Amino acid sequence: MKTRILRITTFTVFAAAALALGCSKRDPAPGGSAGSAAAGSAAGSAAAAKGPLKVAFAYVGPVGDAGWTFAHDKARKAVEAEFAGKVTTSFVENVPEAADAERVIRDMVAQGAGLVFGTTFGYMEPMLKVAADAKQVKFEHATGYKTAPNLRTYDSRTYEGAYMVGVIAGGMTKTNVLGVVASVPIPEVIRNINAFTLGAQSMNPAVTTRVVWVNKWFDPPKEAEGAQALLDGGADVLMQNTDSSAVLQTAEKAGKFGFGWDSDMHTFGPNAHLASAVIDWSPYYKKAVKDVLDGTWKVEQTWWGVKEHAIDVVAISDKVPGPLKDKLAQVKQGLADGSFAIWKGPVVDQDGKEVVAADKTATDDFLHGINFYVKGVQGKLPSAK
């Protein structure tokens, strides 16, 4: 991360801030809080007036979470820079994945937004409702699967980043036990746990992965508690699929290793940090805005990864040996040019059942519905949502 909106250097401060905000992807501060860029706000007439395109973003967490929402807001700023004078942007942070999301999104439309981004899975139904009543507005829903005549979906292949940091984890572990602090049991998160494990096993077949579910996207105290439980259970390298830096900070305190997730988190645990699996939403956001400005916007479902420069592993630690970095570079190149597939069979679940045959590669439809742990992941998978 080049610039931080909120820089927090100790978990104690971060946890206190989180408690004050009371926000997560499940129950952030009621109603959310609004912010706008210097280029302009969403204030305006109920219908989009002639002039710059008004682009509004609904965020599930705080822009200072150092992870998921920070990455989206960084991309929003990139849109402003790319289309200076042609667009104005605004955002509302801490918008719950609940009925209140509909109110916030309707308000964005009422204030003249011509393009609305909803940045979490739980906005799907509220966005569909608003889209049905605001046919003049284009809607973009992150991580969803339903579309409408004026609503399309987009996502990033975060499992590619998970696999790549798994390669590092498999080469760095001394105990052969890895840990993942997971948010909620939806296919996106299960994919990432499995990909992390497969990446680690590509370097060290003896590796096993233990998982703690916190059932929140952003809850630093719970994330830290889960991380400590994994460390106490023998894990010496941690990954997360949550939104704060608490997991990495916990690894730092314990003298163990961890990774940044969604954004570059190396400053939060400089000794523990091995690398960060990051998302760059700016290529897609720029495309979406350009589509609207050019009049070429159409309904489609987009899932971008390393190939499209949407996923990367950055800030690789000097502690990672050269041969391991070379292997990581090889995997990244293979993902970019299509010569390597993470989900090429045989893929076996934790019960020994072959779920992807040796001569097959899992389809995107298969990955979108994944509801099992691969061999090597310990524990029972909670009911997928």
Positions of PLM-derived features:
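Repetitive helical segments and hydrophobic/amphipathic motifs
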Residues: 13-16, 34
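Bacterial N-terminal signal peptides that target proteins for export
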Residues: 1-12
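Short amphipathic alpha-helical "recognition" segments used for binding
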Residues: 6, 29-31
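Bacterial Sec-type N-terminal signal peptides, specifically the leucine/valine-rich hydrophobic h-region
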Residues: 18-20
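Bacterial signal peptide processing site
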Residues: 23-27
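A residue-level marker of the well-folded mature domains of exported/periplasmic proteins
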Residues: 31, 39-385
